Amino acid sequence: VIQNAKREIYMEIWSQDFKFFEKELLNAYNRNVEIRIVGYDNFNSRFGLVFEHAFGRDIELSLGGRMIIIAADDSEGIVGKISSLKNDISDTNIIWTKNKGIVFIIKEFIVHDMYLIDVEENLVEQMKYIYGKGFKRLKDKVLGSNATYMIH
């Protein structure tokens, strides 16, 4: 997917998984492919535009793994979960697709996270006032107050 990209790559990835993609992403960046990343868990990159997701640990605990999400040139995508259990990959599931409709949804998911991260970073006090600490009121509204699924 990364090697095939000509214009843009959008991705969401945890810092410990980034090392497996960094060389190819740097090659793409050096080919003038725009790289936009939502990074989790103290993420750091020397290239591309990075949005740091603040709830990486919570999401990983809730899912039992780390998401990997990539959209390239509106034509190819990857989405899945990498298991947190070091010796058990049975819960690791990743799909690759060239279905443009699915790639569109993958990219929209990433872009949506980027918008929210930027808003959260710039309106910290307002968000806390409106939604409470950790966005509790928003999570309760969207997911229900008894939800066990706490992805954000």
Regions of interest found by a model, annotated:
Residues 15, 20-152:
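PLD/PLD-like phosphodiesterase catalytic module centered on the HKD motif
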Residues 1-11:
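Interdomain hinge/linker segments and adjacent boundary elements that couple functional modules
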